[in-house]
């Protein structure tokens, strides 16, 4: 987990005082933290957008992992000074339209790699956030 995500995790844990989120100890895990009720993927965006992007591979893996472990999959996205919380498990249950599409995107977001690949991505309107911190 990058330092930006750790700071977001610390902020989130102010809301999870009785059941704090624990950072994943596996570097290549598809989610960043979990507790007994949730698995959480954390993203930090430099700008605020009306929609946020979720990659299908993380979406599908984390939904399945959450289901197998009787947890909810939550996507936490920081834009500007706000953290938008999306309960992906519930959005999926309510047949949310993620508007999936193939898109050319950088292969790795954390590295200065300019190589693009096609990724299947979906979109979530920020107004559909479960909570905003």
Regions found by a protein language model. Name each.
Residues 33-48:
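Conserved catalytic cores of phosphodiester-cleaving nucleases, focusing on short active-site segments
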Residues 1-25:
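Acidic-basic catalytic patches of nuclease active cores, encompassing PD-(D/E)XK
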Residues 7, 20, 44-91:
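Catalytic cores of nucleic-acid endonucleases
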């Amino acid at each position: 987990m990058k330092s930006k995500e750790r700071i977001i995790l610390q902020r989130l844990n102010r809301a999870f005082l009785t059941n704090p989120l624990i950072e994943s100890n596996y570097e290549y895990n598809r989610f960043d933290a979990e507790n007994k009720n949730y698995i959480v993927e954390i993203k930090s965006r430099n700008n605020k957008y009306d929609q946020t992007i979720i990659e299908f591979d993380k979406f599908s893996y984390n939904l399945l992992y959450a289901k197998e472990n009787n947890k909810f999959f939550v996507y936490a996205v920081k834009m500007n000074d706000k953290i938008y919380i999306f309960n992906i498990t519930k959005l999926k249950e309510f047949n949310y339209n993620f508007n999936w599409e193939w898109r050319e995107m950088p292969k790795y977001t954390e590295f200065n790699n300019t190589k693009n690949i096609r990724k299947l991505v979906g979109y979530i309107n920020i107004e559909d956030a479960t909570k905003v911190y």
